[in-house]
Amino acid sequence: MPVIPPEKLVSLQKNQENIRNFTLLAHVDHGKTTLADSLLASNGIISSKLAGTVRFLDFREDEITRGITMKSSAISLFFKVISQNDEKRVEKDYLINLIDSPGHVDFSSEVSSASRLCDGAFVLVDAVEGVCSQTITVLRQAWIDRIKVILVINKMDRLITELKLSPIEAHYHLLRLVEQVNAVIGTFYTGELMQLADNDEVISDEGIYFAPEQGNVVFASAYDGWAFCLDQFSEFYEKKLGLKQKALTKCLWGDYYLDPKTKRVLQPKHLQGRRLKPMFVQFVLENLWAVYESAVSNRNLENIEKIIKALNIKVLPRDIKSKDPRNLLLAIFQQWLPLSTAILLTAIREIPSPINAQANRARKVLSSTPHYEMIDPDITLAMESCDASKEQPVLVYISKMVAFSERDLPNHRRKQLSAEEMKLIRSKLSESIESGINTISIEENVSSTNSDNLEGSTTDMDDDKDILIGFARIYSGTISVGQEVYVYGPKYDPVNPEKHITKVTVESLYLMMGQELVYLETVPAGNVFAIGGLAGTVLRTATLCSSPNGPNLVGVTQQMEPIVRVALEPVRPFEMNKLVTGLDMLNQADPCVQIAVEENGEHVIMCAGEIHLERCLKDLRERFAKIEIQASQPLVPYRETTIATPDLLAKNKELSIGFVTATLPVGGVTIGITVTPLSGSVVDFLLKHSKTIENVSSNFSKKNRNVVVSESLTKSMEEVLTPEKFYERLSKLLEEENSDLGELKNHLDSIIAFGPKRVGPNILFDKTKKMRDFRRQSDETKLIPSDLSEYVVTAFQLITHQGPLCAEPVQGICVSIDQFDISDDSEDSKLLTINNPQIPGQVISVVKESIRHGFLGWSPRLMLAMYSCDVQATSEVLGRVYGVVSKRRGRVIDEEMKEGTPFFIVKALIPVVESFGFAVEILKRTSGAAYPQLIFHGFEMLDENPFWVPTTEEELEDLGELADRENIAKRYMLNVRKRKGLLVEQKIVEKAEKQRTLKH
């Protein structure tokens, strides 16, 4: 097929009824990019024989090397549908906006960016591997965004060539697979019903499940270039069987059988013991199996000739005689069941046009935006109707910023000449040769006619730089180059329309064609496009609107929080400015990465995982900063906690563990503090209700303190409780405690702070009731406890933010102020005034040290950041997977065999600190047969005291005085302390009196 000119695609943008915007979603390596290749081949962009091997939309070097997609990429395609209507031939041209998205868990943010721009999605599932962890993630994203989903059961050829299943076995395998996917959808539906249990709103489950007879399931082999829906076979057999197509389509899936004598469709109860095959097996699968049997398994040229004749297709003799069976398969299937036709026809039939999609989704999307009732009603109506008239307000959603090389922009690229232009140039050239005119002048004329906009292209491109382009969808109106629009930041709120809003001029508009861009003058509503000129204004996502009172569409929740941190510095210090500029561009171009500057001046990037980190470093070195960068070892987060061990409680029955009394250096002020561990249930409750704690914290004092909370917390979908409900649940949890914490349920009104950052899982109690007593006696300058409450809270926040073990955040302690006395009899009582500048520092220092001693009085523990690891492996390599997990100090928590497949699913927990290189090692040990997916699971306590030394006779006998067994917790703690420059008790020289002879 000839290449479709961009002008043809641009002309189709104005007809919203014939536009389809969809994305490809799947688990890693389930065939998204291979399927996209076949769709591109239908437009002549790549050869149909190379489809599946080119991976055209994976144009990054690291994507090609690893064989996985890392960045979402978009391309526009043309598709013509010819139909018969009342004996008239009707032709319709469609514009297909396709977005290919990554499947690896590290790039989940790219999936949400792609999904938000589309009206539908094809979710690919490997026919052998089935539903995997990332399959559930992408299905959940599609459910949240309310887009139409079509299931593609890909790699059907593996059932024949690898599993060697018979058609009847494959039938039951596919039935179970569709049920598995529907079970996932069912969990989303029931979960939403539970959330709306208190409301009168009723959600229908009509149309949410996948059923091949309804046309929302496609069976495919993207690598072999074929795909089909049931209606294709029902149309073929309609006349032969004498059944109506709709009725036949319903019978081609499930337990339906055809009586060969009466030509009637039977159900299982009417079989009467006869062994008939299901119609799906008889009319669909056996035909596919016959092709593979004759072309691949047992090559039989005679059978191949019969198949070609029966299908009424033409296959070249060279393809029939080819030694590579794939050439023959492609030649047969691309004429019989072409993949692009099945996918695109399904997209046109099942996925709604932008007009229909926005009519159904617009109200729900807008109702989730801040202060929806204040939005201009004209914008709401224009969005619902997808009105593209120039009089309507422009509303655009910027999903993410994409980096393009400046030389790849249309104004720096030579325009490709049409056949007519090339013919004209050749004729002029031949005339010049005949007339003897110097050809140099002709070449100059040719270059001048080569492009209308070559001005500026002669600029020096040696210093090539990257330009950030917005990846966008327009919902209403028509946006034009040179038009002025308002940019709403993520924090924009119609209540304060003057904040987080900027006015910009649209510099350029583009049609995205993979790694190429096509210049546009205007873009009407319903289209996916790229927009330039926003690099200094938009950070990651934004909303563009021609009105200052529009909706803020940036309500995307980030599913994958960055957990791996790395400190960066330039190899040449004088290039620090380039590093800072590069980090700013990376921060805009990557939706998941986070950039921070530490107190010591270090620049730190936070990534979702090891592969994500490698991609970010590569982008910095080669695209954004273009300098040599030195990266530290990954900085893994820890948490510090303390517990009550049985032996500790037995030794100190009469002593109060964790109680510390301290006096200020100026004298006269005595503070008694008790530190007690919180139970896991209380800690989980506090972590779950961070937003509620934020609201409660603002009422703790007469001053409304600034509450620091991370952006991810403010965007979370957690349940926000009222203060009364929060205290009621907390009281109930404390009442269940068997320790001294049980009595604290009666002192909930004495809570004066949570920490760290005023929202953490640690509690500060004031049992003395003095910290909030602001009544004074006659002397107004004399200290009272309430004057020092702010400094006590500050000390609590500091020590919980940087704990005693290795200055990592503390989790799960309760600090109670049991004593707070200010003596009048002290010799230094004159110094105890509110005007003494020494008091604040001394209070903070003393309280911090007291909490530290109380914390260490119990049995301290480190909490490790953990990855949840899913590995799919065969029985042959299962033992090696266990070996690698054990070597990395992980533990297997579940193992199950996938029914009907040779695969085992192994679920394990692995410390993040031990995970670097884990994926590579698994691949090496299993020869590529197993690939892990790592998702951040949370923090888990390492049950080992970092200060433990042998003390009992048995321990001394087994381990010796120096403890021959390595203390893992101590090693982790010392490594963090070394990195942070904290004191480490380690001998630099050990046994110096011994001679050591070195051989040179």
UniProtKB/Swiss-Prot annotation:
<dbReference type="InterPro" id="IPR000795">
    <property type="entry name" value="T_Tr_GTP-bd_dom"/>
</dbReference>
<feature type="binding site">
    <location>
        <begin position="100"/>
        <end position="104"/>
    </location>
    <ligand>
        <name>GTP</name>
    </ligand>
</feature>
<keyword id="KW-0342">GTP-binding</keyword>
<dbReference type="InterPro" id="IPR000640">
    <property type="entry name" value="EFG_V-like"/>
</dbReference>
<dbReference type="InterPro" id="IPR020568">
    <property type="entry name" value="Ribosomal_Su5_D2-typ_SF"/>
</dbReference>
<keyword id="KW-0963">Cytoplasm</keyword>
<dbReference type="InterPro" id="IPR035647">
    <property type="entry name" value="EFG_III/V"/>
</dbReference>
<dbReference type="GO" id="GO:0003924">
    <property type="term" value="F:GTPase activity"/>
</dbReference>
<feature type="binding site">
    <location>
        <begin position="154"/>
        <end position="157"/>
    </location>
    <ligand>
        <name>GTP</name>
    </ligand>
</feature>
<dbReference type="InterPro" id="IPR027417">
    <property type="entry name" value="P-loop_NTPase"/>
</dbReference>
<dbReference type="Pfam" id="PF00679">
    <property type="entry name" value="EFG_C"/>
</dbReference>
<dbReference type="GO" id="GO:0043022">
    <property type="term" value="F:ribosome binding"/>
</dbReference>
<dbReference type="GO" id="GO:0042254">
    <property type="term" value="P:ribosome biogenesis"/>
</dbReference>
<dbReference type="Pfam" id="PF25118">
    <property type="entry name" value="EFL1"/>
</dbReference>
<protein>
    <recommendedName>
        <fullName>Ribosome assembly protein 1</fullName>
        <ecNumber>3.6.5.-</ecNumber>
    </recommendedName>
</protein>
<dbReference type="Pfam" id="PF00009">
    <property type="entry name" value="GTP_EFTU"/>
</dbReference>
<dbReference type="GO" id="GO:0005525">
    <property type="term" value="F:GTP binding"/>
</dbReference>
<keyword id="KW-0378">Hydrolase</keyword>
<dbReference type="InterPro" id="IPR041095">
    <property type="entry name" value="EFG_II"/>
</dbReference>
<comment type="function">
    <text>GTPase involved in the biogenesis of the 60S ribosomal subunit and translational activation of ribosomes. Together with sdo1, may trigger the GTP-dependent release of tif6 from 60S pre-ribosomes in the cytoplasm, thereby activating ribosomes for translation competence by allowing 80S ribosome assembly and facilitating tif6 recycling to the nucleus, where it is required for 60S rRNA processing and nuclear export. Inhibits GTPase activity of ribosome-bound EF-2.</text>
</comment>
<dbReference type="GO" id="GO:0005829">
    <property type="term" value="C:cytosol"/>
</dbReference>
<dbReference type="Pfam" id="PF14492">
    <property type="entry name" value="EFG_III"/>
</dbReference>
<keyword id="KW-0547">Nucleotide-binding</keyword>
<dbReference type="GO" id="GO:0042256">
    <property type="term" value="P:cytosolic ribosome assembly"/>
</dbReference>
<comment type="similarity">
    <text>Belongs to the TRAFAC class translation factor GTPase superfamily. Classic translation factor GTPase family.</text>
</comment>
<feature type="binding site">
    <location>
        <begin position="26"/>
        <end position="33"/>
    </location>
    <ligand>
        <name>GTP</name>
    </ligand>
</feature>
<dbReference type="GO" id="GO:1990904">
    <property type="term" value="C:ribonucleoprotein complex"/>
</dbReference>
<dbReference type="InterPro" id="IPR005225">
    <property type="entry name" value="Small_GTP-bd"/>
</dbReference>
<keyword id="KW-0690">Ribosome biogenesis</keyword>
<feature type="domain" description="tr-type G">
    <location>
        <begin position="17"/>
        <end position="246"/>
    </location>
</feature>
<dbReference type="InterPro" id="IPR014721">
    <property type="entry name" value="Ribsml_uS5_D2-typ_fold_subgr"/>
</dbReference>
<dbReference type="InterPro" id="IPR056752">
    <property type="entry name" value="EFL1"/>
</dbReference>
<dbReference type="InterPro" id="IPR009000">
    <property type="entry name" value="Transl_B-barrel_sf"/>
</dbReference>
